[in-house]
């Protein structure tokens, strides 16, 4: 098999961004290739939301999935040939695409975060009783805060796209050259290790600059206005999150959970590529080898499987975020993991995972429709935001 880091297969494209998707993107893709194709060639573009909210090798577990679309390949020049103007159009349209998809999935995203972090909210007295499930969380949130509150924290999530894309564009080529291992030349394990190292390094580098926005988004989304608590919120907006956190905890408060987030990037990539290379040769054989729907199904299972397996890491990092400004904090990510297991049980590490999968489906449909509108009005599909 050819070097999959440089020549991604359909299944790799299905993998897309991880749910920390929510955090790491492959960045702006250079459109400088005009492939030679027959009239029967199919091109499918797929991105994953899931784990978008977590991390991505790029699920990006963030990100979303574009429902497969057959279309004639469109030729475009490289950014250097197109000039800065057209590059900025691609960049901005990618931002619009990200804003549309993230905004559409924001209600489910907020419910996911509320369910995931409800135990921290109960401990701090900001939630009177636990949620009974996704439907109960929706009902109570709308009843106590109003329908528009389902989008609380979405602004920070949308803003985060632009610096993430710019940083990924800057970092991805550097680390790709630094860890330039090829599967057919250097062997599987060197390629695998290089993939983890380059993805982890690029992801951590980008994450360092945008982590505070993810922190702010998490705190705003979990700032419930319970009717029984008098309807008072902890934060009045994005700027207020920064102001109060810096006052109580300093810079460290904005980066609580950063280390385990970087670990999550590597864990997800290891699970994703490990599962891909182990399962694909066994399952996609014979007539299924070039079957798109079989590849789609396997890709969906692998990305969600890797996302669910690494979901506890996302829970730990977000639970650590929730302690900034509070009197009692976890000593470390390991301490947080141990305390959650001891006091709440392993099930607590997976709270909100169901809503996370629903968010992937919702974002996929909206992003697919938006891409088709771009083709209809502009004659091409601009970059989609999966960060």
Swiss-Prot record:
Positions of ADP binding: 160, 172, 317
Keywords: Antiport, Membrane, Mitochondrion, Mitochondrion inner membrane, Repeat, Transit peptide, Transmembrane, Transmembrane helix, Transport
InterPro entries: ADT_euk_type (IPR002113), Mit_carrier (IPR002067), Mitochondrial_sb/sol_carrier (IPR018108), Mt_carrier_dom_sf (IPR023395)
Activity regulation details: The matrix-open state (m-state) is inhibited by the membrane-permeable bongkrekic acid (BKA). The cytoplasmic-open state (c-state) is inhibited by the membrane-impermeable toxic inhibitor carboxyatractyloside (CATR).
Compartmental location: Mitochondrion inner membrane
Record Gene3D superfamilies: Mitochondrial carrier domain
GO MF assignments: ATP:ADP antiporter activity
Chief location of this protein within or outside the cell: mitochondrion
Region (Important for transport activity): 317-322
Residue windows of the Solcar repeats: 85-178, 190-282, 290-376
GO cellular component: mitochondrial inner membrane
Coiled coil: none
Topology term for the membrane: Multi-pass membrane protein
Biological process per Gene Ontology, one example term: mitochondrial ADP transmembrane transport
Function: ADP:ATP antiporter that mediates import of ADP into the mitochondrial matrix for ATP synthesis, and export of ATP out to fuel the cell. Cycles between the cytoplasmic-open state (c-state) and the matrix-open state (m-state): operates by the alternating access mechanism with a single substrate-binding site intermittently exposed to either the cytosolic (c-state) or matrix (m-state) side of the inner mitochondrial membrane.
UniProt record similarity statement: Belongs to the mitochondrial carrier (TC 2.A.29) family.
Protein name: ADP,ATP carrier protein 1, mitochondrial
